[in-house]
Swiss-Prot record:
Gene3D superfamilies: 2.40.10.170, Bovine Mitochondrial F1-atpase, Atp Synthase Beta Chain, Chain D, domain 3 (1.10.1140.10), P-loop containing nucleotide triphosphate hydrolases (3.40.50.300). This is ATP synthase subunit beta. The gene is atpD. GO terms for cellular component: plasma membrane; proton-transporting ATP synthase complex. It holds the Pfam family ATP-synt_ab_N. ATP binds at residues 155-162. One of its GO terms (molecular function) is proton-transporting ATP synthase activity, rotational mechanism. Its EC number is 7.1.2.2. It comes from Streptococcus uberis (strain ATCC BAA-854 / 0140J). Produces ATP from ADP in the presence of a proton gradient across the membrane. The catalytic sites are hosted primarily by the beta subunits.
Length: 468
């Protein structure tokens, strides 16, 4: 094990010099430095650059407070390794695989895997055409998720990405019954804490591993924590042959941390100040999130859209890797429609007759056509009013508004805020309900009865309570 000494510390960046013929550590190797003489307080560094003359530049995974020049640094000879396997289920830990849930730490001989790996070879990959039912009408109808696919939840600040991902955890993890890995990347600690206790109460935690590198942590930890969660998911997929659900909140923070690290390493910034290696870093992460002939990984990733600008390089780079996109729209939140999923901007590779079936496909495309026509007519309505529309257009607008409201529903995870019980709607009920609305079966029912309900039976009940 070669050793060096700290040459300089600049925030989370630490330069280490290996003199007297000591072997230089490889890129991505983990180095350990002890802050105190009795070796109880250690900090892990990851090698990022080799500067020449025996000097390497590293990124700290924890705060560098207390580090001084001249402290001894040891090369572990391998990348950061984290615990994997059944021991991780029901536990919460950080980027280094250290437990942060006040329970006993992992045993020293626990199985560990390095967080840096190659993506599966082309001939190992497998594709699936099986739909993953979410119980959320707008998703199941218009942008269905594939089992073993990659899903992105796009949205600006405060439009409901985290609530949607929590509802998906509630619906899918409980229905699916398999193993889930939740990775919190650069998000609020409070949200992670709430999610942990909620999972504990529902019993889902027993089949879930949780990894957190939150907002208050150094950029190195936020950049690498996604790989820690992914490594755990890969082990369940490859070694145990499981179908795994991988939730990541938020991929943008992974990019943001990479940008901070890049600037600290002295790289020239690229478009909008992002790191020049943005596409490479995103590709290295996303190519590992895949399904193989041993097992599947279905990933659901929240992706923050800065200033609601979808052309920003961070969300634009992530777009290319996804099977389904669920776009959250601020205008819909202003109308009180939750989840605020844009039915026209969201898309899915799975929405084809071969995968969802002919009836589902026809209903979904007709819903999109009606909503698109309504959007085109909105300018005329705003300027001239409804009276200028033809009778057919008036009927279409009425149905479009009913569809728009019916795409909303109450969430189980939001019950404590709304006071309304959440609803889980099977795909078959969703398709049947929208088909009947399109046929004009419910044109006589007031629009308000369609707002925030489950299946169409709830609409009829609500209308009855309103006196219709």
């Amino acid at each position: 094990m070669s050793s060096g000494k700290i040459a300089q510390v600049v925030g989370p960046v630490v330069d280490v010099v290996f003199a007297n013929g000591e072997k230089l550590p490889e890129i991505n190797n983990a180095l350990i430095v002890y802050k105190d003489s009795d070796k109880k307080q250690k900090i892990v560094l990851e090698v990022a650059l080799e500067l020449g003359d025996g000097m390497v530049r590293t990124i700290a995974m924890e705060s560098t407070d207390g580090l001084t020049r001249g402290l001894e640094v040891l090369d572990t000879g391998r990348a950061i390794s984290v615990p994997v396997g059944k021991e991780t289920l029901g536990r919460v830990f950080n980027v280094l695989g250290e437990t942060i849930d006040l329970d006993e730490p992992f045993a020293a001989d626990a199985a560990r895997e390095p967080i840096h790996k190659k993506a599966p070879a082309f001939d190992e990959l497998s594709t699936s055409s099986e739909i993953l039912e979410t119980g959320i009408k707008v998703i199941d109808l218009l942008a269905p998720y594939l089992k073993g696919g990659k899903v992105g939840l796009f949205g600006g600040a405060g439009v409901g990405k985290t609530v949607l991902i929590q509802e998906l955890i509630h619906n899918i993890a409980q229905e699916h019954g398999g193993i889930s890995v939740f990775t919190g990347v650069g998000e609020r600690t409070r949200e992670g804490n709430d999610l942990y206790w909620e999972m504990k109460e529902s019993g889902v935690i027993e089949k879930t591993a949780m990894v957190f590198g939150q907002m208050n942590e150094p950029p190195g930890a936020r950049m690498r924590v996604a790989l820690t969660g992914l490594t755990i998911a890969e082990y369940f997929r490859d070694v145990e042959g499981q179908d795994v659900l991988l939730f990541i909140d938020n991929i943008f923070r992974f990019t943001q941390a990479g940008s901070e690290v890049s600037a600290l390493l002295g790289r020239m910034p690229s478009a909008v100040g992002y790191q020049p290696t943005l596409a490479t870093e995103m590709g290295q992460l996303q190519e590992r999130i895949t399904s193989t002939n041993k097992g599947s990984v279905t990933s659901i990733q929240a992706i923050y859209v800065p200033a609601d600008d979808y052309t920003d390089p961070a969300p634009a780079t992530a777009f290319a890797h996804l099977d389904s996109t669920t776009n959250l729209e601020r205008k819909l939140t202003q109308m009180g429609i939750y989840p605020a999923v844009d039915p026209l901007a969201s898309s899915s590779r799975a929405l084809s007759p071969e995968i969802v079936g002919q009836e589902h496909y026809e209903v979904a495309t007709e819903v999109q056509r009606v909503l698109q026509r309504y959007r085109e007519l909105q300018d005329i309505i705003a300027i001239l009013g409804m009276d200028e529309l033809s009778d057919d257009e008036k009927v279409l607008v009425g149905r479009a508004r009913r569809i728009q409201f019916f795409l909303s529903q109450n969430f189980n995870v939001a019950e404590q805020f709304t006071g309304q019980p959440g609803s889980y709607v099977p795909v078959a009920d969703t398709v049947r309900s929208f088909k009947e609305i399109l046929e004009g079966k419910y044109d006589h029912i007031p629009e308000d009865a369609f707002r925030s309900v489950g299946p169409i039976e709830d609409v009829l009940e609500k209308a009855k309570s309103m006196g219709y």
